[in-house]
Regions:
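Recognition helix of helix-turn-helix/homeodomain-like DNA-binding domains
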Residues: 36-51
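Short, basic-rich loop-to-helix N-cap that marks the start of a DNA-contacting helix
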Residues: 49-61
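Short, charged recognition helix plus adjacent turn
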Residues: 2, 62, 70-85
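Short basic helix-loop element that most often maps to the first helix and adjoining turn
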Residues: 15-34, 59
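A short, Lys/Arg-rich alpha-helix, primarily the initiator
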Residues: 1-23, 69
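Conserved hydrophobic/aromatic packing and binding residues within compact polymer-binding modules
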Residues: 17, 31-32, 42-45, 71
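Active-site phosphate/pyrophosphate-handling residues
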Residues: 30, 40, 55
Length: 85
């Protein structure tokens, strides 16, 4: 995967994460607390400045009280909306 593709994937995941967080009425600070993250982590992920590891995706899903596969699928849907496979 090239750097532009990696960046686009990180941004798509960030949009999916933000949508899931907002659907639950959570602030970034709430998500950080629930997931035991540094307070800057949700912001960095939502803006595509950081790519999540598998473990972080699991923690995020748990904090959002959703299945990790659903969160991941939402990120893939974001990529497809942009015309990326």
């Amino acid at each position: 995967m090239t750097t532009p593709q990696r960046n686009q994937s990180a941004r798509a995941f960030g949009r999916a994460l933000k949508a899931a967080r907002l659907e639950r009425g959570l602030r970034q600070e709430d998500l950080a607390e629930r997931g035991d993250f540094d307070r800057t982590c949700p912001s960095m992920l939502e803006h595509g400045r950081r790519s999540p590891s598998f473990f972080v995706i699991l923690q995020l899903a748990r904090a959002l009280r959703m299945k990790a596969v659903v969160l991941f699928a939402e990120a893939v849907a974001q990529l497809r909306k942009e015309g990326r496979p």
